[in-house]
């Protein structure tokens, strides 16, 4: 939940706030917690006091719900300045190419929880770059995505772009562009072989419609996740949730 008056974003959830404390406590502008959580944030309160930043043990957890707009606060809410999503530029992508870094590109992922889960998986598998389009259908960083990321937001860079096709065109021959599709002929098991000793851009599509036809046409490879009995059997469910699928794909990409 955003506080537009103060340009703040509420970060809630124990793991998210604890990781924020360990990695970037200076970003916290205000802290609120329940009596049950108070013993776990004594050290942070001392730091905030030294920095002359307010903190408060609330009398009623309803106040935490009001601050973050959710009942899923887990007894703590930290306010931070609303994160600025940095625009992706050629200097950054040139570094990706040089260092053979990989990135996750989201094609209109509309659910904030899915964005958070994807960021969590990216952090777990050591992928530091997530790219989102400036599109009304694309979820941005919210209180919900922060909570679901379970601290992953502190370890992943999120960039914005105006045009997915333009980025994919710019990366042609420089990075391997791998999209996901239910009608793909290749599977995620071959991703390591597709890398060609280059960085990889994994494109994940919208929850309902997948990646667009134009984006598919700009991919070097299209892959799907093989199910039990592949290719002879058909699964009871056609596909995984996009966040679940992202974890499988990242495992195949980063696994030894």
Model-derived regions: residue spans:
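N-terminal positively charged helical leader segments and presequences
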Residues: 1-94
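RNA substrate-binding interface of SAM-dependent RNA methyltransferases
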Residues: 15, 19, 26, 33, ...
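Structured adenosyl-cofactor binding patch, chiefly the S-adenosyl-L-methionine
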Residues: 18, 29, 144-149, 213, ...
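Short, glycine/polar-rich helix-capping loops at beta-to-alpha or helix-loop-helix junctions
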Residues: 40, 137-144, 209-218
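General small-molecule cofactor/ligand-binding pocket signal
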Residues: 54-59, 159, 178, 223
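Short beta->alpha connector loops at strand-helix junctions that form conserved
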Residues: 59, 107, 133-134, 162, ...
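Short, hinge-like loop/turn segments at secondary-structure boundaries
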Residues: 73-76, 147-151, 195-198
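Active-site/ligand-binding-proximal alpha/beta "capping" segment
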Residues: 177-238
């Amino acid at each position: 939940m955003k506080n537009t008056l103060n340009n703040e974003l509420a970060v809630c959830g124990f793991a998210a706030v604890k990781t924020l404390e360990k990695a970037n406590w200076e970003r916290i502008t205000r802290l609120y917690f329940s009596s049950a959580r108070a013993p776990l944030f004594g050290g942070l309160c001392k730091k905030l006091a030294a920095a002359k930043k307010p903190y408060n043990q609330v009398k009623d957890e309803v106040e935490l719900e009001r601050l973050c707009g959710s009942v899923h606060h887990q007894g703590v809410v930290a306010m931070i300045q609303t994160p600025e999503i940095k625009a992706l530029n050629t200097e950054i992508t040139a570094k990706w190419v040089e260092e053979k870094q990989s990135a996750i590109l989201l094609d209109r992922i509309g659910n904030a929880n899915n964005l958070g889960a994807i960021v969590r998986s990216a952090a777990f598998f050591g992928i530091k770059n997530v790219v989102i389009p400036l599109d009304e259908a694309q979820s941005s960083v919210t209180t919900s995505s922060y909570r679901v990321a379970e601290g992953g937001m502190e370890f992943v860079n999120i960039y914005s772009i105006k045009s997915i096709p333009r980025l994919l065109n710019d990366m042609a021959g420089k990075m391997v562009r791998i999209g996901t599709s239910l009608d793909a002929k290749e599977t995620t098991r071959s991703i390591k072989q597709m890398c060609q000793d280059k960085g990889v851009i994994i494109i994940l599509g919208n929850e309902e419609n997948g990646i667009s036809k134009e984006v598919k046409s700009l991919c070097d490879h299209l892959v799907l996740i093989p199910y039990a009995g592949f290719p002879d059997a058909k699964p009871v469910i056609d596909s995984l949730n996009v966040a679940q699928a992202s974890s499988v794909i990242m495992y195949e990409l980063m696994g030894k």
